[in-house]
Amino acid sequence: MKLQKLYLFLFLLLFFTPVKSENEYTFYSGIFDTIDKEKDDKATLYGLEHNNPVLFKDTFIGRFSPITGGFITDKDSIFIYTGVQAQYEIGLLKITPSFAPGYYEKGDGKDLGMALEFQSKIKISLDFFKDTKIGYSYSHISNNDWGTINPGVNNEIISFSKIF
């Protein structure tokens, strides 16, 4: 059932993407709950994120653009999110902080306290080839103490991004 939700999300993400605009897709994998104090909830995660580099807003604190994505873990936990990211460039190096609220379903994984969770992430990537980036991300997901519990999770991710 949870895998069906992810497939539906990915289908809708690809179906409603404008055909003529540039779209950046990020495929990633990593470790869910890297600081697993109880030693029972660490899992491998696999995800997809979409960013439209044409939809952006330049401000005095950076270039902001919307992101949408989701991941699933090998313990059937699912997180689907949409939010905003900023991008800062230093030559080939890209630094991308982001914030995204999302829907979390624990599956057989860690109970984060409620369905509404917030992800804050920092990604460092290198633009090796034209429109192709390889990166490392560190993220934290929690519910801001709005739930009955708020254990939070920290994740480490390796990503591959390509603009199509």
Spell out what each predicted region is.
Residues 1-23:
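Cleavable N-terminal export/targeting peptides
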Residues 19-23, 53-64, 89-95, 131:
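Short loop/turn motifs that connect adjacent beta-strands in outer-membrane beta-barrel proteins
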Residues 21-56:
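Outer-membrane beta-barrel initiation region
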Residues 25-35, 61-73, 96-105, 137-142:
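Transmembrane beta-strand segments that form the barrel wall of outer-membrane beta-barrel proteins
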Residues 34-44, 70-81, 109-115, 145-153:
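Solvent-exposed loop/turn segments connecting transmembrane beta-strands
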Residues 44-48, 126, 151-164:
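Outer-membrane beta-barrel "beta-signal"
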Residues 50-52, 86-88, 126, 140, ...:
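Residue-level signature of outer-membrane beta-barrel architecture
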Residues 75-99:
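Helix-adjacent hinge/juxtasegments
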